[in-house]
UniProtKB/Swiss-Prot annotation:
The keyword DNA damage is assigned to this record: no
GO BP terms, alphabetized: positive regulation of transcription by RNA polymerase II; regulation of transcription by RNA polymerase II; salivary gland development; sensory epithelium regeneration; tissue homeostasis
Annotated region described as Helix-loop-helix motif, given as residue ranges: 107-145
Organism placement in taxonomy: Eukaryota, Metazoa, Chordata, Craniata, Vertebrata
InterPro entries registered for this protein in UniProt: bHLH_dom (IPR011598), E-box_TF_Regulators (IPR050283), HLH_DNA-bd_sf (IPR036638)
Domain bHLH: 93-145
Subunit-structure text: Efficient DNA binding requires dimerization with another bHLH protein.
Protein name per UniProt: Achaete-scute homolog 3
Amino acid sequence: MMDNRGNSSLPDKLPIFPDSARLPLTRSFYLEPMVTFHVHPEAPVSSPYSEELPRLPFPSDSLILGNYSEPCPFSFPMPYPNYRGCEYSYGPAFTRKRNERERQRVKCVNEGYAQLRHHLPEEYLEKRLSKVETLRAAIKYINYLQSLLYPDKAETKNNPGKVSSMIATTSHHADPMFRIV
């Protein structure tokens, strides 16, 4: 029995309609993909009133799929892109704008890498670096600059010999700040 505090107007049981009260549904209703999806879920859902409610006269899924001949009869996007083999296509104006945004994004990323390359020492500018090589060189250079700023911390790390050899090697060059070994 239901609690009468919140929903006092709800009946205890759902009404049962006789067979004469059922109205036949149109064929287009049967073929509508979203209706079919909601009316015939993948897994059956049990209901506490399943014994008392009559079953609606819907055709089986195989009948629906067999009569569904148009490749893409609906003009709205489906929740799943490849639902029943139909892909929603955007208009040409939308595609052009999307492609232009992507070109702008790639251009900005490439400009960022170009600016990063100009902050690296000259020895890295001898050849054109890939994006991965640019990032690795920047990491090495940042670590080198940190070792110059904080030599005590650099010597206490895992490779104290490597840091001291970097500092010793740079002392032979005219401008030690831009040399990395």
